[in-house]
């Protein structure tokens, strides 16, 4: 019986790079049965396992054809394990999908890709803490540089053999009214997943102070009750001054110099 491992992730996290690095030239591309969504399959280096590259999707709860195809494949039980590919530089965004996948497939691995790019930005991730929070193995790697791929391949084989002990975290959903529509329920469920993803990211990710943090502090001052009104009045006074008096300076300068330019022609 063919054993299949699925690769899942949001767009632009390097999932295809990971897939190509793990399969090399032993792959082919086709369409999902009854769908126009492209799929790729390949044999893991060393043989014994088939990797299926699922369509990139931000959520399993949305309704695009790609998202339906990914969810149907995971729910069908065709995959004995799932590799969740995440962007180390934007971990929180990747975790929303990862948490949703863990609800339908417990046997999973998180591939923390693009670690090199995260390091350039000064982002540090506590891998051990992330493993504790998610309850699954986490493998840091940089697929484009070939770093961490041997460890990832070994983890995939252990997972496919059922040797990885996993205790996936659960999303805490609020109580929902029976009158809610399916779309409203999906929105609430996605918000709950986003909240859990934020909690995990705050625990495991350390980012350097950046321009956005400085902007937040500036907003706190400008929009505060103590300084906001005086700053607004000062700004309005400046605009009022420029409107009544400030405009005279450039207009007088232009008038003087333009008249001076026209003087030679006036005497001709």
Each PLM stretch: what is its role?
Residues 242-268:
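Interfacial/capping segments of alpha-helical transmembrane domains
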Residues 1-63, 76-77:
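Conserved G1/Walker A P-loop phosphate-binding module
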Residues 42-45, 69-139:
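Conserved C-terminal guanine-recognition region of P-loop GTPase G domains, centered on the G4
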Residues 184-206:
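Extended, hydrophilic extramembrane loops/domains of integral membrane proteins
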Residues 232-241:
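Hydrophobic core segments of alpha-helical transmembrane domains in multi-pass membrane transport
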Residues 210, 214, 222-232:
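Membrane-interface helix starts
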Residues 116-168:
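Canonical P-loop GTPase G-domain recognition
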Residues 202-216, 258-266:
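Short, membrane-interfacial amphipathic segments enriched in basic
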């Amino acid at each position: 019986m063919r054993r299949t491992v699925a690769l899942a992730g949001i767009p632009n996290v390097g999932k295809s790079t990971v897939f190509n690095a793990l399969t090399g030239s032993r792959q082919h591309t086709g369409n999902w049965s009854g769908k126009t969504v492209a799929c790729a399959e390949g044999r893991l280096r060393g043989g014994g396992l088939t990797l299926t590259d699922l369509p990139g999707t931000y959520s399993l709860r949305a309704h695009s054809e790609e998202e339906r195809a990914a969810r149907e494949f995971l729910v069908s039980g065709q995959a004995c394990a799932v590799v969740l590919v995440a962007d180390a530089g934007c971990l929180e965004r990747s975790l929303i999908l990862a948490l949703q996948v863990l609800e339908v497939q417990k046997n999973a691995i998180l591939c923390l890709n693009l670690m090199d790019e995260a390091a350039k930005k000064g982002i540090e991730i506590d891998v051990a803490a992330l493993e504790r929070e998610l309850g699954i193995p986490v493998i840091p790697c940089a697929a484009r540089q070939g770093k961490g791929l041997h460890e990832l391949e070994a983890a995939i084989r252990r997972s496919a053999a059922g040797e990885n002990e996993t205790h996936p975290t659960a999303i805490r959903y609020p109580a929902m009214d029976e009158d809610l529509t399916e779309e409203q329920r999906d929105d609430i469920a996605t918000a709950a997943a986003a909240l859990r993803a934020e909690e995990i990211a705050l625990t495991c990710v350390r980012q350097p102070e950046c321009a956005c943090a400085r902007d937040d502090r500036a907003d706190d001052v400008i929009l505060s009750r103590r300084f906001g009104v005086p700053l607004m009045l000062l700004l309005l006074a400046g605009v009022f001054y420029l409107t009544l008096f400030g405009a005279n300076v450039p207009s007088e300068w232009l008038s003087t110099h333009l008249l001076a330019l026209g003087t030679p022609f006036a005497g001709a």
